[in-house]
Amino acid sequence: MKKLLLVTTVLTAFIAPVAQAHHVWLEQDGKTVKLQFGEFGENQRETTPGLLDKFVAPKATLVGAKGERDLTLEKTAKGYVVGGAVSAGDAIVVEDNAYPGWETTKDGKTSQHIWVPAARLATTFAAQQPKLALDIVPTGKAGEFKLFYKGQPLPKTKVNAIIPNGWTKEAVSDDNGTVTFDLPWKGMYVLEAHHTDKAGGERAGAAYASASHTTSLTVMQPKGVATMAAGPAMAPSAAH
């Protein structure tokens, strides 16, 4: 029995980091916006059947000058297609607050944990207000962004800026949650951050000991140096 318990603990501890190492992001190709899951910098996108099937109830919202509006998400073999048109100045946010959790056992005590993946697409660098639990938003200043957790600035947290060919730049948010990047390359950037809240809480009537959040912000830099194209696509992860 003790051996079985040890194996279970090891397996759950292994599965959780695999999910958390991944992130979700939004990318726009013409008029089509798609939610992707995988490793943007590695050119890896999860599929169905596969890890994309782990998502339970991702919710998309359009945030614009006229207010907020729910958007549909159509699951395809290689991501979710976001329904509805997005205009300059709009933002799209997506979050899945029902992604399957996991459990760990230590000293005979079993604890539940959850992971909350989220993403934002900003069509301009104009200042935006946070909406997601963990959110990165433009401030309106060139190359400046702000990280929030539950509506409050989140200091001393790593934020990575990534482009499709894998180039990555890391910054740490200051006391006001602000980070600054040069954004020298022309094209798409995905900013990514992680935060774990160990205060515990409750989701769908079930208590959890910690909540791990991963969030991203997609922006387009209209000027700058041309970059090398992304490398060959990495194969999707093995389902587990």
State where each predicted segment sits.
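Beta-strand-rich domain onsets/edges
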Residues: 21-32, 105-143, 205-240
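Short acidic/polar inter-strand loop motif in beta-rich domains
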Residues: 42, 98-104, 197-202
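Short amphipathic beta-strand segments in non-cytosolic proteins
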Residues: 58-68, 157-171
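Glycine-centered loop-to-beta-strand initiation motif
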Residues: 76-82, 173-187
